[in-house]
Structure formats: C-alpha cells, structure tokens
C-alpha cells in the first residue's frame, strides 16, 4: 500500500492530522484514544509490517 493511500484510508475512518514533523504525520481521532504516526512519502510503498501495525493501532 502506498503512503498516500494509507493516509486517505485513515482520514476516511475519521483520523485527522494534528501536526507534521518532516515526512511524518501525527494523526488523532475524535473518539478513539491515542495518536498515530504515519509516514508521508507520497507514492512510495509502506512496509507490510508497518502498514499492519498502523491499521491495528487505528482499529481498522
């Protein structure tokens, strides 16, 4: 999955960017606890393990 596809998936689920540090977005949800750090490398692929971890943390 590409980085921009993962960000779109998170935003569709209700996650929004609270800040960005370099090429990483820190996202938060209105009702879910915690924050997610998501790489913002455009059309570059995100590793399968990292993709799985981010989805698990997001509850997707």
Indicate residue ranges for each PLM-predicted region.
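Basic nucleic-acid-binding interfaces
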Residues: 1-19, 24-26, 31-60
């Amino acid at each position: 999955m590409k980085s921009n596809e993962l960000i779109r998936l998170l935003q569709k689920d209700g996650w929004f960017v609270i800040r960005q540090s370099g090429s990483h977005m820190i996202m938060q949800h209105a009702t879910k606890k915690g924050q997610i750090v998501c790489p913002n490398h455009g059309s570059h692929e995100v590793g399968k393990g990292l993709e799985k971890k981010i989805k698990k943390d997001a509850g997707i």
